[in-house]
Amino acid sequence: MKPDRLNALTDGVVAIAITIIVLELPLPEAPTLTGLRAVAPMLLTYLLSFINIGIFWNNHHHMLSTAEHVDGRVLWANLVLLFFLSLMPFVIRWIDEAGFEALPCAAYGIVLVGAALSYQALEAAIIRLHGRDGALARALGSDLKAKLSALAYGAAIGLAFVDPTIAIAIYVMIAAAWLVPDPRIEHQQIAEHRPRPDKDG
């Protein structure tokens, strides 16, 4: 099976999740700077969530560009990733209703670590399908950055019960680390399509 339908489904779910989040944003109670400041924390949380979803979507796009075809394992791994991304509006609304308390902030981290681990499972499924000599396996190597990010999310979940602001700070730092698109896959694809020198020339 070609990955086109998988990409289309992912694009649709991501677009819906982002739309739901922005529709759930509270409006300022007064048309003043004071009213805007009152909802500023939720606006920043929306921004962080938008960036996180965008990071997963961007990297997913690059990852799927290496797949010539997909199988059942890839389809299910992708569905698990979409499940966690689709939970983002739920945890954002919980934070809006409850405030930046320990449990909602920890739940935000659980969604992020779930998305991170399912993304890695999707990577593994594609590598299993295309082999260790496939473009994705050669581009990623050990993928230490992704593994460290998942560990950091796990630490943030625990720290949310100590101080939720520490957890939020960790979420922001991880997002900042991934804000620049990972160039490894693009570099690998460029290298594969670079014309080889003519030995007879």
What would you call each of these model-derived segments?
Residues 1-201:
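Multi-pass alpha-helical transmembrane bundle typical of ion/small-solute transporters
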